[in-house]
Amino acid sequence: MKKRTTIRISAFLLCLCCAFFTSCKEDDGKGYVFGYDISSNPGSLDPQYASDRESYLIIGSVFEGLFRIGADGNAEKAMAESYTVSDDGLTYSFKLKQDRYWTDVNGYNKKVTAADFVFGFRRLFLPETRAPKASEYFCIKNSDKINSGEITDLSQLGVTAQGDYSLTIELQYTEPSFAMLLAMPAAMPCNEEYFIKAQGKYGLDAERTASNGPFYVKTWNYDAWSNNNNNLVLRYSDKYNEHDEVTPLGLNFFIEDNHITDFTDGTSQSIVLSGSKAKSYLDKNYIYDEFSTAVYGITMNTSNSIFKSDKLRYALLYATDTAELEMPFGYTVADGAVPPSVKNSLGSYRDVVGSKAVVKPDEIKAYTAYQSACAGIDKADLYSVNIIAVENRDEEIGESVKGILQQWQAKLGMYCSISYISESEYDEKLKNGDYTLALTRLNGSYNCPEAYLNSFTGNVNKYSAMNSDYSKLLEKASQAKDEKEEYELCRQAEKQLISDGRFIPVAYVTEYFISTKNCENIIYDAFTGQVDYRNALYFD
């Protein structure tokens, strides 16, 4: 097997050396090089520009923001030594750690200061950056006006430095999830001097990727035309380790598709699986954490199909009884558009708001609505109704969805089928509105109900956009005075989404982060896909 030969030999020799020098000491689990598979080459390690999960994963190991995601899934202080929030919730004042440095594979060495956060946020909102996550931070004073070009004086942005280690962020409205947002990649610092020297290639190779986190990028090899030795090699940062111990020697990220093979043969020590693929690994030989951070549902195209008819949407909604479905392993019946793992200090969103968004099946209402809808619809259009789904991803839950199609046929006399297509073709059809129904998998990019519900707003508009009332509810939720009000506003929006027949919840997906039993202290964030190895241990 030729794949990754060089890196495997290096790792083997490294392990031999470690074994030789530690043979007389008790194994403390430190100094190991962990392996982990990723499916594609990271698009960019520029935190302000990155948008894919592979990039987020590496950025999470290389950069450190004001906050990070802790083992409990909540935001905890990282670069922030301490902070205060004003009584009105609009001003955040931070004292930064004074012992953090920038480094890279070429030995770059400079202290991280408040100016790096100021520059990072200015880049986030500059129109020319085209940052995909900029709108999520429009709570920051004047950020939206800078992003639109209305304001060109960047000093008016509500992010300012008071000396090297004091930072102030002013908001134009309260944001209950602001600490969580400050842990996301887009909020990472950026050293202006380093960025300028990168000459437009910042974060695109190892030589032009700075690090202020526990690891730096030593090598980054990728050849799109070859399956051999595509990988990123990270090693621990000496400067970071001086003040906060980094227990692994390094991380090897392998870019390939054989995740299960590599996990089984020991090339990687952790893997993320769901459904039947996970079942055989949930035994005493492995340790795992489980998360429910994705939800499947049926989305109706209300912009460019016969499902503009609210009566037809209501017919399918009332004819659907998910309680009667047989679910495959790792899936549970969904009672909303936001999955159970979404939580804040109040607890799980689902536990707090309950299942009030669910519409109870009603065969009489379904049939009445269907007959009324058919009076204004060409039968040829009814016969062409089809659900698009993603091949090699949706087949397991697709078997359960067939049960819904049988319900529609039995209760309404309406026939529908499922077509599995490539993910790229699926995304193109959604973009162009070239579909009637879509089997939709909602994944939130961070731990917040709006991260799911915003999929149906005009801002994101991946799916048919809801009306302005829906968007206003979510806008109010993002500006809520506290988490309780945020949850209540999201509950109202979720109920509107479902009761309007735009989205029929089908199933929550349980995702398993599985590691070999000799691993400890590896933290997985199921929302971003980031893995925190700072304190990871491996015992032979």
Features from the language model and the residues they span:
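Ligand/substrate-recognition segments at binding pockets and active sites
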Residues: 226-229, 371-441
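Gly/Pro-rich hinge or "lid" segments in bacterial periplasmic/extracellular proteins
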Residues: 155, 164-165, 171-246, 255-257
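Structural transition elements
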Residues: 331-374, 392-398
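A bilobed periplasmic-binding-protein/Venus flytrap-type ligand-binding module shared by bacterial periplasmic
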Residues: 235-240, 287-315, 319, 328, ...
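Aromatic- and charge-enriched surface segment that lines or borders ligand/interaction sites
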Residues: 81-136, 168, 306
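Ligand-site clamp/hinge motif
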Residues: 233-280
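Detector for C-terminal structural segments
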Residues: 317-348, 396-403, 430-540
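N-terminal lobe/hinge region of extracytoplasmic solute-binding protein
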Residues: 37-87, 210
